[in-house]
Structure formats: structure tokens, C-alpha cells
């Protein structure tokens, strides 16, 4: 797939796409890049969880010449079953093979939604199994202290009793689910990826 001035080969996809022409990646999709530099993780698509900003962010990262894989979680909507504030409906989770696919990479970029408590609970569960440095992209103004209070290891604030293997190294807020991602936010994600991959 030619993107920008460099060609990237992406092994895509494990299941058939959704929508007209199969343009929307379905849950369980893993599109693997030739080199395992960055993996972008999306919530499962559905009525409230749209993968649109993830597609635009991924395209921007690839255009910057960074080898990027994409994983759409099989159970990416809802909140974890052990979250303090339970909810009816779907339950967020990660399969062992999904964690293994993510851990083959150097850096994870994960897109969450707009409820701070949901972001914190999801990040907590994901990073129990994902061991690589992670950048969170979301709409809500969450910060490292919010994550550390729940036992999530972060670059800036370390919890007294860490519950996670992985560490949040950066956060990009203001990315609205289901809306086009502004170029300034895509640039911010790319800048932070380059910083943590030592590409500057």
C-alpha cells in the first residue's frame, strides 16, 4: 500500500470488513505492518464506538514513515467486569492472543472514549497484559494522576501499589469519537510517538 513517499506492506485483515465495500474494520481485525514499531488499538465498532479517528490517526502515522499495525479489540466496548462501578451491557476485555499481538511491538497507541472512569478502568485492564509503553488517545481530559490513583503505572506519577505491567508514557486528549480527527491532534500523536521511539 503506497502511503506518502514510502511504501508500507500491511497484512490485512483477519475478518471481513463492515459497511458498504467493507470499509469499516470489524472487531477482531489485526492488520500487521512489516515491522513491529507501533500498534494502534481501537475499541470494537458499534453504535457508540466508531473506529473513525483511529483510521485517520493510523494513516497520519504511516504517512510520517512509521511502520504501524492496527488491532480492533474483539471485546472493546463497555467497561471491565471488575470495575468498581459496574454497568449493564457489554463488557470490555482483552484476549491472550490480542495481548500477544500488541506486545510484539515497541509502542502501543490506544484509543478510548469520553468517560474518565471508563478510560481509567479500560487502561487498567489493558495494561495488566500489555507490557510495552502506551500512549492513550481520548476525548476526556484525563491525566496521569487519574490513572495512577487506580494503580496504573505512568511515566510521570508512579502509584504506591502498581496493578499493571505496562506504563502510560503519554496522553493525547480532545480526540472526539466518531468525528474527523483534526490535523493538529494527528501531529501531536506523531510527535509523541517519535519522542518515545527516539526518532527525533
From Swiss-Prot:
GO terms classed as biological process: methanogenesis
Keywords annotated in UniProt: Methanogenesis
Domain of life: Archaea
Quaternary structure note: MCR is composed of three subunits: alpha, beta, and gamma. The function of proteins C and D is not known.
NCBIfam families: met_CoM_red_C
Protein name stated in the entry: Methyl-coenzyme M reductase I operon protein C
Organism: Methanocaldococcus jannaschii (strain ATCC 43067 / DSM 2661 / JAL-1 / JCM 10045 / NBRC 100440) (Methanococcus jannaschii)
Native organism taxonomy: Archaea, Methanobacteriati, Methanobacteriota, Methanomada group, Methanococci
The encoding gene: mcrC
Amino acid at each position: 500500500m503506497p502511503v506518502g513517499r514510502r511504501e508500507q506492506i500491511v497484512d490485512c485483515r483477519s475478518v471481513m470488513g463492515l459497511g458498504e465495500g467493507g470499509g469499516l474494520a470489524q472487531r477482531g481485525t489485526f492488520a500487521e505492518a512489516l515491522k513491529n514499531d507501533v500498534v494502534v488499538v481501537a475499541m470494537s465498532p458499534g453504535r457508540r464506538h466508531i473506529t473513525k479517528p483511529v483510521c485517520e490517526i493510523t494513516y497520519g502515522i504511516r504517512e510520517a514513515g512509521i511502520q504501524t499495525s492496527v488491532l480492533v479489540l474483539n471485546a472493546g466496548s463497555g467497561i471491565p467486569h471488575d470495575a468498581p462501578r459496574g454497568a449493564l451491557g457489554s463488557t470490555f476485555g482483552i484476549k491472550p492472543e490480542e495481548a500477544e499481538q500488541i506486545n510484539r511491538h515497541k509502542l502501543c497507541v490506544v484509543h478510548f472514549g469520553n468517560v474518565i472512569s471508563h478510560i481509567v478502568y479500560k487502561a487498567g485492564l489493558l495494561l495488566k497484559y500489555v507490557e510495552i509503553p502506551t500512549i492513550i488517545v481520548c476525548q476526556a481530559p484525563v491525566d496521569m494522576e487519574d490513572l495512577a490513583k487506580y494503580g496504573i503505572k505512568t511515566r510521570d506519577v508512579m502509584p504506591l501499589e502498581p496493578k499493571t505491567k505496562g506504563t502510560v508514557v503519554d496522553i493525547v486528549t480532545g480526540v472526539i469519537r466518531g468525528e474527523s480527527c483534526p490535523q493538529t491532534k494527528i501531529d501531536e500523536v506523531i510527535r509523541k510517538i517519535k519522542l518515545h521511539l527516539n526518532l527525533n
